């Protein structure tokens, strides 16, 4: 199996820190390069910053986390998330870097589902599935800003009934909050007018070394999981779980990401590396730690 340069993608609340609406950024991003109009709505770059000077930048296009400046063990601030430095690339290159993905992250086969005896046919991407809620999805929408302070940004998107086949008008409120202790809270709230399926997520890619071209294979990862969602050869979930014991997916004892990534394993071969959903042992309890990532060179730790 070929060796892969990979980024860490964590699809839940992030315990690192965050940027506020000023005219300059520590990451070097220019707010002017995010000032545009997409589908008749203005886009901007918003900056959150705490008293320690830690900064995160967010754009309302896709409610995306654009940059996250975090200190290493010596206090040097570096960007630890992958992204572009302008709105045009986010709009045209089709990547979900830092985006809010919805209505449903992942794939739905068919693509259809049944709720209360009613079957809903969803948008087909040409491969018999709908992926990440379809196109355009939440990542391709310009969100409304409904509140902003020094350390908080609140965004809203209203998905109309029937968008990409999903039932119900879905109103999503997303709040980014930068706390004084250095934690970044990412909070989703959604209400619907009909019974529906919702699976929202942030799609940030992390490299906590602070160097976007450096492999993450030397970073140590711990995940509180005994099993993953099994994929078929087309990278669609089978509905079965795959036990991680005695496989490269067992991170219950922390080890380097690259330690087993080149092992001959059917699930690894399907995805070309680690790109799976880990079933947490404490499902539904957000007070429990799900995963910890550590970079020895920089001293940074990411906890979710």
Show where each model-derived region lies.
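Bacterial N-terminal signal peptides that target proteins for export
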Residues: 1-8
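Bacterial N-terminal signal peptides
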Residues: 8-17
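An exposed, glycine/acidic-rich loop-and-rim segment of catalytic or binding clefts
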Residues: 23-56, 60-303
